[in-house]
């Protein structure tokens, strides 16, 4: 899908606004360093070859700053068909922070923003408090991600049983169409 500059700019603003809302929410958390948390870098990368998003600490003029970089071409919202948003295998089945079904592609984009902001606060707190780094998708990450998902993503999601049925039906129809496409036979 080719998007014009103004459409990309609108989606960049969407990402920035939601990341800022998450930043403000984190600043209310009762944990040393949260009040000082500020996303100094919010980047939307539209390069189609960019497949992975990132959140964490970046270096700017020798200073460590929290930030996120979102691989946008993978999450450009399209609407209509049900999709399955996957999370990392270790927690994809988790009912609260795992994968989900939706027919609104803003939902996976919001989940990716929340996921990367969770990494940014995770790494920020490790650096700010001088504590040892833990696992990137360990308990601390999951705790931060769960808080963000509870406020910014999960309340928007459709009924997962119904959407899961719609997704499986859609995938079955698509698979059957691909399998049973008539082929002209030349004798």
Language-model segments: residues:
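Walker B catalytic acidic pair
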Residues: 116
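Active-site-proximal or metal-binding-adjacent scaffold patches in catalytic folds
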Residues: 1-111, 120-187
